Amino acid sequence: MQFICHLNLRSESADRQVLTADLVQAEIQRIHQLLGAGTIRHAWKKADAVAVVLVLDVADEAECRDVIGALPFSIAGILGVEIVSQVEPYADVFPERGAH
């Protein structure tokens, strides 16, 4: 199953003592690992905000939330989760792709 996740920094929690260069590097490294493993299919940074949109390919919503919960920003308590929604191919628009 694929899930779309909209994540941002919790501004009330993301102070300079928590949001260090090492933490940012750890977050980026973990996203790269999950992309390499195929758990994260796509990752986009919003142009107008400190936020990202991820597409995860996992067994269910619980696994999706577990993956997000294990991200360094989440562990540090600064990751806000706005949307977690299951998505599927739009077969009427792309019939050749069908169900994944």
Q: Would you name each region that the model predicts?
A:
Residues M1-H100:
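Conserved, structured core segments of small domains
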